[in-house]
From Swiss-Prot:
This is RNA-binding motif protein 25. It comes from the Eukaryota. Pfam families: PWI, RRM_1. SMART domains: PWI (SM00311), RRM (SM00360). GO terms for cellular component: nucleus. Its main location: nucleus. One of its GO terms (molecular function) is RNA binding. Phosphorylated; the phosphorylation level is repressed by abscisic acid (ABA). Specifically associates with functional splicing complexes. Associates with exon junction complex (EJC) proteins. Residues 515-524 have a biased composition (Acidic residues). Keywords: Abscisic acid signaling pathway, Coiled coil, mRNA processing, mRNA splicing, Nucleus, Phosphoprotein, RNA-binding. It comes from Arabidopsis thaliana (Mouse-ear cress). The gene is RBM25. Induction: Induced by abscisic acid both at transcriptional and at post-translational (pre-mRNA splicing) levels. GO terms for biological process: abscisic acid-activated signaling pathway; mRNA processing; regulation of mRNA splicing, via spliceosome; response to abscisic acid; response to water deprivation; RNA splicing.
């Protein structure tokens, strides 16, 4: 240690550089180079440094001019107290391979003191002040300090080092080298202070498993019976948000862990045996704690045994100590290191045993209350391999064994004493004491055997009880498990039944919706057909009424014209009669009347017949239509009045009969009178026999005047020619009208049949057999097929599924005209509509099947697996299109753009 400053490892690195030839070229950081080392002192004198203020700086030597002094020197170093070290005795300097330089003879440091006094600014100083003309020692530069005098605070020197130790030697001064720093010994920890191991952090965390059904609060309450719990860490399942089946609990002391291991190992909660374990760090901590506790108990018992057994002598104490050491070493330490259950190896006092018993009672009470209040859910099954049972038995075996070992060690510890009081075995009373100790040891062994037998019986009883509880719990669990499985099966069946019911309801609902949609479509179709039929019926009725009105109007006009002609003819006849009366005179009135009565009667009978027939026909039409023209009624009345037949008054006398048909003031007759007049029997003219006419002719032929004969001849000619011609013409007109009316009725009847046939075709009544008129019209249509258009062809195509599937298709015409090429675009378009994308393969498949002349039912079966529910609709539409194309080809109808 004395040569530490001179070693190359601790020396200044500048000491290895070559010597400089120009000492003033490198500025020296030492501002005071004129200091000299202190003179040697005697060892008897105390090392006291005089507190003398520093003197003025030395003047520069004469050989160094002032111009060569440095002008820009660094500022002085700041005030910095130097480090102070205490020398360490017997310090060996590490060998670096370079021997230290020898010490100079002219400088001998005082023993026990440092070579230089530590200064506040870090530079070494000397004791005392050199005189003004003194030369500095070798190795120090001789140049003046550019700084003013520094006032250095004085301080009391340290006491000398340890007596007998090698002191420090200064490094030899080398000329031309800057000054060295003071040699400071290394700072070493005082040897008197003992090494203190840092306090070990207690590892008091315990792992408890198989607590999946146990709440954390209940687990904390159970652990509080063992000791205070500082913290707990129990993870939660992220899906169910329930705590997992294990947890980490940190106790405040190691006693809590030991008690928890003793009381909770293999403890059954909710049908599961708790798994209590510690990690390696906690196990080591517990081992140390148990060893320390055993050691403390041993020392305490040794001290107690020393006080109690001093009267027996040192020999007995030494024997007890040896036996205790041997037995404890065998039964205590070996079992602590070998036994997994560390807690059972701890030395328990009476208070700790009482605390364990109370904690055990509290834990059992809490578990029983939990079983009563919360029997469900059933506990999970125990491990199948039975490792838990074996571990429980092993742990309990360990408990009993360690208890026996502890009792044995405790009994031996009572008799032990200190090692230093062991007596000599040559004492005369040693044999007696040895015999007494053997007897006592035998009694203790017998007591230990008895205790072991009792412990074994107790352990067997506990094992049987535990096994019985486990079997009961297993049976209860199996029973509950079977009940739970039965309930779950029933619930699953109910769920399946509910699902089937829901599916059935859904199927029924879809079927009802589809049926309602079809009903609505059918209702819409029937409503449209009914509406169309009603419109057609109304249109036909209106047309029929218009035609009837037109026919009635024509008939009325004809009747009016006929009545006018009849009136004109009657007026003409009246004029003729008046002329005849004027010509014949009053005397021949009777004879003329007699002669002309047959002719007049014939003529009047004809007119009466025509008028009555006209009036009757008109009245019937009036009643049938329910309406009539007032003016026409007036004309008819006037006509009837004009044509009113004259009543026969006797042979050849005829009355006018106008009184019976006199109109009322308003030219209207009462309904009863009009009905009676219409229902009156028409008058029939009297036919005279030939004998009567000859008698009348012979009676008046002799004295007939010539002018009367001329007038009679004229009237006869008129009556014989006019009525006949008029009658023929009237008959012709009547036959023409009847013919026109019959032809009109035929045309109307034909149109009515056509409309009925169209209505039946619109309704789709294809199953009804065709009537005779339909067959005739069908023949006419077959003849005129080339004049039909696409609309009429579409109307002839069947609409129902049965009719379409039973329709005979002309496949020869299909193959001849290659109808499949015309069908291909339509099929591709419909497939695009049904599937949403083009399927060229499916289109080719359908076209190829139609070329093979498959039936509609076969085509439906082929497409059923591809189009599902839409297959039937597609086949129906395609078959209608196929029939239309074949019919169009047969009829030669060109394709229209809209078709």
């Amino acid at each position: 240690m004395a040569d530490e400053s001179s070693s190359p490892a601790t020396g200044d690195p500048n000491s290895q550089k070559p010597e400089s030839t120009t000492p003033i070229s490198i500025p020296n950081p030492n501002p005071n180079p004129s200091l000299t080392p202190p003179p040697p002192q005697q060892h008897s004198q105390p090392p006291v440094a005089p507190l003398v203020p520093p003197g003025p700086p030395y003047a520069p030597p004469a050989q160094i001019p002032s111009s060569l002094l440095p002008t820009n020197l660094p500022p002085p170093p700041p005030f910095r107290p130097g480090m102070q070290f205490t020398p360490v005795a017997n310090f060996q300097n590490p060998s670096s391979g370079v021997p230290p330089p020898g010490s100079m003879p002219q400088y001998q440091p005082q023993p026990g003191m440092r070579p230089f006094q530590p200064m506040a600014n870090g530079y070494p100083g000397i004791h005392g002040v050199a005189p003004p003309g003194a030369m500095p020692p070798h190795g120090l530069l001789r140049y003046p300090s550019p700084y003013p005098t520094m006032v250095r605070p004085g301080f009391i020197m340290r006491p000398p080092g340890t007596i007998g130790a090698v002191q420090l030697a200064p490094r030899p001064l080398i000329p031309g080298m800057p000054g060295l720093r003071p040699v400071m010994p290394p700072m070493v920890r005082p040897a008197s202070l003992p090494f203190v191991t840092p306090a070990e952090k207690p590892q008091t965390t315990i792992y408890i498993g198989k607590i999946a059904t146990v709440e954390n609060d209940f687990m904390m309450s159970i652990l509080e019976f063992c000791g205070h719990v500082k913290s707990c860490l129990r993870a939660e399942d992220p899906t169910t948000k329930k705590p997992k089946g294990f947890g980490f609990y940190e106790f405040e002391s190691a006693e809590g862990i030991l008690r928890a291991i003793r009381l909770l190992t293999q403890r059954t909660i909710d049908g599961q045996e708790l798994l209590v374990n510690v990690n390696q760090a906690t196990k080591e901590y517990l081992l140390k704690y148990v060893e320390k506790k055993i050691e403390t108990a041993k020392k305490a018992k040794e001290s107690q045994g020393t006080k109690e057994n001093q009267a027996e002598g040192p020999e007995s104490e030494q024997d007890k100590l040896e036996s205790a050491d041997n037995e404890t070493g065998k039964d205590g330490e070996s079992k602590i290191k070998e036994n997994i259950d560390i807690a059972n190896s701890a030395v328990l006092t009476d208070e700790e045993r009482e605390a364990d018993r109370e904690a055990m009672e509290k834990i059992e009470t809490a578990i029983e209350e939990r079983l009563k209040s919360n029997p469900l859910p059933p506990p999970p099954p125990p491990p199948a391999d039975g490792s838990g049972m074996e571990f429980a038995f092993k742990s309990k075996d360990g408990d009993s064994n360690t208890d026996v070992a502890r009792s044995d060690a405790a009994a031996n510890d009572v008799e032990t004493s200190g090692e230093h009081n062991r007596p000599d075995t040559s004492s005369p009373d040693w044999s007696k004491r040895n015999d007494r100790r053997s007897r006592e040891r035998g009694e203790k062994e017998q007591e230990m055997d008895r205790y072991e037998r009792e412990a074994e019986r107790e352990r067997s009883r506990k094992e049987r009880e535990q096994r019985r509880k486990l079997e009961d719990a297993e049976r209860a669990y199996q029973t509950r498990l079977r009940q739970w499985e039965r309930r779950e099966r029933e619930k699953e069946k109910e769920r399946q039944y509910e699902k089937e019911k829901e599916k059935e309801k859904e199927r029924k609902r879809k079927k009802e919706i589809r049926y309602e949609e079809e009903e609505e479509e059918d209702d819409d179709d029937s409503r449209r057909r009914w509406h169309r039929a009603a419109l057609d019926e109304r249109r036909r009725r209106q047309l029929r009424e218009k035609e009837d009105d037109l026919a009635d109007r024509l008939k009325e006009e004809e009747e009016v014209a006929e009545a006018k002609r009849s009136a004109e003819e009657q007026n003409l006849q009246q004029q003729q009669l008046d002329a005849l009366r004027i010509l014949s005179g009053q005397a021949a009135i009777g004879s003329e009347t007699v002669q002309t009565s047959p002719i007049e009667n014939d003529h009047k009978a004809t007119l009466q017949t025509v008028g009555e027939s006209a009036n009757e026909h008109h009245a019937a039409d009036f009643e049938e239509n329910g309406s009539g023209n007032e003016s026409m009624a007036i004309d008819n009345n006037s006509g009837s009045e004009a044509h009113a037949p004259s009543k026969k008054l006797g042979f050849g006398l005829v009355g006018s009969g106008k009184r019976t048909s006199v109109p009322s003031v308003f030219y209207e007759e009462d309904e009863d009178e009009a009905r009676k007049a219409k229902k009156m029997k028409p008058l029939v003219p009297i036919d005279y026999s030939t004998e009567e006419q000859e008698a009348v002719a012979h009676g008046g032929s002799g004295n007939t005047p010539p002018h009367l004969a001329l007038a009679a001849e004229f009237a006869k000619r008129i009556s014989s020619t006019n009525p006949k011609e008029e009658t023929i013409e009237t008959e012709k007109q009547r036959s023409r009208r009847s013919h026109d009316k019959a032809s009109h009725r035929d045309r109307e009847r034909e149109r009515e049949r056509d409309r009925d046939r169209d209505r039946v075709r619109d309704r789709g009544d294809g199953h009804s057999g065709p009537t005779k008129d339909a067959k005739e019209s069908g023949k006419a249509k077959i003849i005129d097929t080339k004049f039909l258009d696409a609309k009429q062809l579409i109307d002839t195509i069947p609409k129902t599924k049965e009719d379409l599937f039973s329709y005979e298709i002309n496949w020869a015409m299909y193959d001849k005209h290659q109808v499949h090429e015309r069908m291909r675009p339509w099929i591709s378009k419909k497939i695009m509509e049904f599937l949403g994308e083009e399927e060229a393969t499916l289109v080719d498949f359908i076209v190829s099947n139609t070329q093979q002349h498959v039936q509609a039912s076969q085509m439906l079966e082929l497409l059923q697996s591809i189009l599902d529910e839409e297959a039937e609709m597609f086949v129906l539409k395609m078959w209608r299109m196929l029939i239309f194309e074949i019919k169009r080809v047969e009829a030669g109808v060109p394709v229209k753009s809209k078709a």
